[in-house]
Amino acid sequence: MAPGDGKTSLLYHLIATAVLPSALGGRQAAVVMLDTDGRLSVPRLRQQIQSLAGRSPQPDGCGSIDETTLSALKHVHVLRPQSLASTVATARSLEKYLLNADNHNSFERHIAFIALDSASSFYWQHRADTEESALMAGTASSKSMPQPNGYVQLAAALKNASRALHAPVIFTSWHLGPVRDPNVNGFALEGHSVRPSLPPPWQDLPTLRLIVQRTPVRKLPVEISLEEARQESEQRQRVVEQGRFECFVNEWGVDERTLQALRSGFEFYVTQEGVRMENSKD
């Protein structure tokens, strides 16, 4: 939902699972990553791939874990557009780039998914440009043509790439509204429902929306002794150091029948060794 809430770390896990060989529990595929936030860390991704590869016995002929990791990394295609317009152009060029065997090593692999981290990167600049265009259009002397909506173009480009490559799109975004705090009167999110912050048509673009956040640590009670507060603080610090996160379905705009099928979530830990998944929970 916000920077540091585990979204990119969860993407590392998904990417590692996608590019590892099937003999090690992976999908032996390729991934395209549009890193508009510039937050992707190759050493961290490498660490996650090594961690997953090391959890399964190395089959004969697979080579060492380091060799397997290096081979898997060659199938992660990281692109870093610097503006909304360049992101649109990059998304439009994906089919041409990936279907040319001379461009990369993944021609014989299918694309597991296209990732965009994050769709919110250019939100404020887009909003400022939109407001400026509206202001200019409202002046009598302005004869400029309205500019195409960048977010509409990006949504269309990603959908076209998804269809052409037979690959789903995974995108992250930030929650730009108020943050839930049950201790503050006047605002509280109901259940697991968060209204999407991105402009149209992005509210209706995803088939499934997930909320990822650090597992909340309850606040200290008001009536508590100093000794109890010290012990409680130590326990709270241990919980924070675990790097525990939770992921659950965003119920905004989802009908009840679909919710009954999807009402579950999972927890994961972000550690120095990488992301460790917990079992699914109801």
Language-model features: locations:
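N-terminal regions of ATP-driven nucleic-acid and macromolecular assemblies
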Residues: 1-282
